[in-house]
Amino acid sequence: MAMENPFEGKEIWFGVGSQDLYGEEALRQVAQQSAEIVDSLNASGRIPVKLVLKPTLKSSDGVRRFMVDASADDSCIGVITWMHTFSPAKMWIRGLEALRKPLLQLNTQHHFEIPWETIDMDFMNLNQAAHGDREYGYIVTRLGIPRKIVVGHYTDPAVADKIGVWARACAGWQASNTMNVMRWGDNMRNVAVTEGDKTEAERVFGASINTWAVNELVAAYDAVKENQIKDLIEDYKAKYEIAPELLDKDYDSLFIAAREECAMVNMMRANGCTAGVDNFEDLGALPQLPGVGPQRFPSEYGWGFSAEGDWKTAVLVRIGAVMGYGLEGGASLMEDYSYNFTPGNEMIMGSHMLEVSPSVGTIAKPRLEIHPLGIGGKADPVRLVFTVAPKKDAVVVSLADVRTRFRMLMNVVDVVEPLGSLDKLPCARALWKPEPNLEISAECWLRAGGSHHTCMTTSVGREAWEDFARIAGVELAAIDAETTPREFERELEIEDVFHELANRH
């Protein structure tokens, strides 16, 4: 089992601006040098999606056709624009207003340094990105079109890295817009932050969130063939340490857990879903609250999963899994549980009763175990037990419905090793030190109304989520090393005013 490559068959279109004023020879050089730039970026190995150079854009009609075609082509997940020469910005208006794909403005040039001894007006006319990109940047800003801006010579690895992160965010955006979320049951009773406007979520994120009766999952459970279950158990044996009792007296429990995973996967695939949620209060005739199956959703299938009906976090986990494809680490549901206030070692323990995924990286091989669970009213569930491996500059991301809009909240964190063995804790767990410190992080998180459920990503960090939020047009409040409570509170107040004005009709 392996996650499908979300970048395969996808493209980012590269549009270069100029105008007919410069003549045939200059435009020939523009096309040639543009091809060299795109070839170099593609060869860098830092951008997971192929860049495709399109014919030089020299007129309003040409720009509009380029943008309309990009918007209509499902293989195109984003557009990069660069002005090799001066390109009058009025000719970009109709095209930019027709664009429905993420946009990146690249501010680069073909030459690395000014040719001090030979530069003449022919060179100046041909190489004036510093001129043309300012004209173009003005019109994009005037039109209010969100875009990422990357500045630097195209041979600089940092430039390719920034484009690569943005390309991952573009893939996350496409995954969001094609996402079907399967809810087995509804929200956990009386819980507030996991609720949300599913209709508005489809408008904003493109994700379709719907409910399937738990009885349908029970029927799928009954229909699973024995050979599928046994094949899955062999996969467990290959990837995890297994507690001896699960291969002996408790083998039936392992068989049931594998059967539940098969049923969930079969239903998800049959309905084209890439994220799912369940609720321990609504299990019908299922023998166990699903544990190992949901834990494997991100790591084995690239799907999102969250518990207790929390579809918003499931959406984030799917987006995080797509953005981080091919990188070390991954994405998982996480939940803030307990603080460590020891001076110098202030940290947060995150966990969940069953569903944290090993996709985020583990210190040792995950171990399949069986333990009692005091909620759900079902048989003892089988789950993977592990500790998340240390990782600097990871992030935890929350999505909350704050009445008038969705707010994404992100904290940059360093995942660290625990200070003890945690031998008696029968669930997956992570320890992290939040930036700038525990006190300020927690105060700001509470101030912003952040959820106790988050998506932890150890593959992509802050920049990818910032790019995603910009593409989605969603507020992102970030807590990092520079955050102070006073400034953070002011930023939230400014966001409130901004969105209040923006939502007036």
UniProtKB/Swiss-Prot annotation:
Keywords: Arabinose catabolism, Carbohydrate metabolism, Isomerase, Manganese, Metal-binding. Pfam families: AraA_central, AraA_N, Arabinose_Iso_C. SUPFAM superfamilies: FucI/AraA C-terminal domain-like, FucI/AraA N-terminal and middle domains. The keyword Manganese applies. Its EC number is 5.3.1.4. Binds 1 Mn(2+) ion per subunit. Pathway: Carbohydrate degradation; L-arabinose degradation via L-ribulose; D-xylulose 5-phosphate from L-arabinose (bacterial route): step 1/3. It is an enzyme of class 5 (isomerase). One of its GO terms (molecular function) is manganese ion binding. It catalyses: beta-L-arabinopyranose = L-ribulose. One of its GO terms (biological process) is L-arabinose catabolic process to xylulose 5-phosphate. Its cofactor is Mn(2+). Mn(2+) binds at E308, E335, H352, H453. GO terms for cellular component: cytosol. NCBIfam families: PRK02929.1 (NF002795). HAMAP family: Arabinose_Isome. Catalyzes the conversion of L-arabinose to L-ribulose. Belongs to the arabinose isomerase family. This is L-arabinose isomerase.
